[in-house]
A protein has these predicted regions:
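A generic structural motif
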Residues: 28-37, 94, 216-221
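Active-site-proximal region of nucleotide-activated glycan assembly enzymes
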Residues: 115-178
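Donor-nucleotide binding loops and adjacent catalytic segments primarily
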Residues: 44, 49-53, 177-182, 186-234
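An amphipathic, basic-hydrophobic alpha-helix
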Residues: 69-98
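Conserved nucleotide-sugar phosphate-binding/catalytic loop shared by glycosyltransferases and other
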Residues: 4-12, 29, 34-79, 164-165
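Short amphipathic alpha-helix
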Residues: 17-29
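An aromatic- and histidine-rich active-site surface loop
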Residues: 44-48, 98-117
Length: 234
């Protein structure tokens, strides 16, 4: 009988650190029996995404290392400490074989708690430029999976590094054009231009493209993912 692989995923705050982890969970499940748990933020969009994938979700406190003045800089160290303590509790209770993170400050104290317990930590780097959270987790990580070869240079101290390409769920490759045309009321003939700054949109991108839309709409059918709450600004 195959041993069940226990995997603790950490990340969130936005869709960026969440969707690669869901893809990894899906891929591992196809290889053999797995049991997963996800530690995320208390206010990010990841809880709905994780629970929809059938993974138990637990919110833990998260701080942020800001490089600018904010009153939250005085309280965030306590949030980070609390996140580490609660993360340690989950590690001791769940006893994962491996911890997997794709970024986000909520993951940092969990990564170091895992290292203290001797649990391997796998880091996913899906952007060209590593964020601060991933750079902070690098010393606690046993292995790195990266998309862009240029980003590997920032993680030379991680002993195992592997170019994995895009980490996406199978459903992305199984899209149905006819269903998309019906949902967005598209004509199947003209090309479609998708504008997105990620799951939360990007205010700068949203505003920058406004003068260009009339010209683009002469040649393309435009789908603009603005991010939740950003549509009113357009």
């Amino acid at each position: 009988m195959a041993t069940t692989l226990r995997v603790l995923f950490t990340g969130g705050g936005s869709g960026g650190p969440t969707t690669p982890l869901l893809a990894v969970n899906e891929a591992l499940g196809a290889l053999g029996p797995t049991e997963s748990r996800f530690l995320g933020t208390t206010s990010g969009p990841e809880q709905a995404m994780v629970e929809e994938a059938g993974i138990p979700f637990y919110a833990i406190p998260a701080g942020k290392l800001r490089r600018y003045f904010s009153w939250q800089n005085f309280t965030d160290p306590f949030r980070i400490l609390a996140g580490g303590i609660i993360g340690l509790k989950h590690l001791l209770q769940f006893k994962p074989h491996v911890v997997v993170s794709a970024g986000s400050f909520v993951s940092v104290p969990v990564a170091y708690a895992a290292r203290a317990l001797g649990i391997p930590q796998v880091l996913l780097q899906m952007d060209v430029l590593p964020g601060l959270a991933n750079r902070l987790m690098a010393p606690a990580s046993s292995a790195l999976g990266y998309y862009f070869p240029a980003s590997e240079r920032a993680f030379r101290r991680i002993p195992e590094r592997k170019h994995v390409g895009p980490v996406v769920r199978n459903s992305v490759y199984q899209g149905d054009p006819e269903r998309a045309n019906q949902r967005f009321q598209l004509n199947p003939d003209p090309p479609v231009l998708l504008i997105t700054g990620g799951g939360q949109g990007a205010v700068g991108l949203n505003r920058a493209i406004q003068p260009l839309l009339p010209t683009w709409q002469e040649h393309f059918q435009v789908i603009h993912l603005t991010g939740r709450g950003s549509k009113a600004d357009l």
